[in-house]
Amino acid sequence: MASKFKSPLHEMVSTTPTDLWNDSCSIHELTYAIEHGAVGATSNPTIVYNVLQQELGLWEDRIHQLIEENPNWSEVEITWKIFEEIGLKGAELLLPVFEREAGKKGRLSIQTNPANYRNAEAVAKQAVYFDSLAPNIQVKAPVTQAGIKAI
């Protein structure tokens, strides 16, 4: 007998009060997760690095375009721009969930640069910028003295 559920994940979110968050902003993984009931996703530098390893073909042209358009940018600036764009793509995929749930679900969690863990001003500036990118982005900041001050 065929199951009415698409997967064990779909069964879990359909039969329990569990909210499923995808621990990746990979386009392929997140698309699958949303189709099976996920209501959120997270990103951070390590996750985005793994996404690039898995989905480089989806991002390689954009990386080259950014380098070409911004010849004076450092590797760090290019990296953070790609980090931002991958996070934005995840937020875009989750936007229908965000709208359906009136903002209570459907969020993409994006992390500020952990290298700024001692710099409250830099954490706050990046957090405000990330928050401006999409209505369903929530920002993670380091729980350090500077991070708490930034919050």
Go through each PLM region and give its residues:
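N- or domain-start disorder-to-order transition segments that initiate the globular core
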Residues: M1-C25
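Electropositive phosphate-/nucleotide-binding environments in soluble metabolic enzymes
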Residues: S3, S24-I27, T42, K81-L88
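Short alpha-helical segments and helix-capping/turn motifs at coil-helix boundaries
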Residues: S7, S24-E29, A33, L95
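Short, well-ordered coil/turn elements that cap or connect secondary structure elements
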Residues: T15-P17, E35, A134
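Short glycine-/small-residue-rich flexible loop motifs, especially phosphate/cofactor-binding loops
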Residues: H10, L30, I151
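Catalytic domains of carbohydrate-active enzymes, especially glycoside hydrolases
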Residues: Y32-N44
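Active-site beta->alpha loop and helix N-cap motifs at the rims of alpha/beta catalytic domains
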Residues: A38, I47-N50, E55-A150
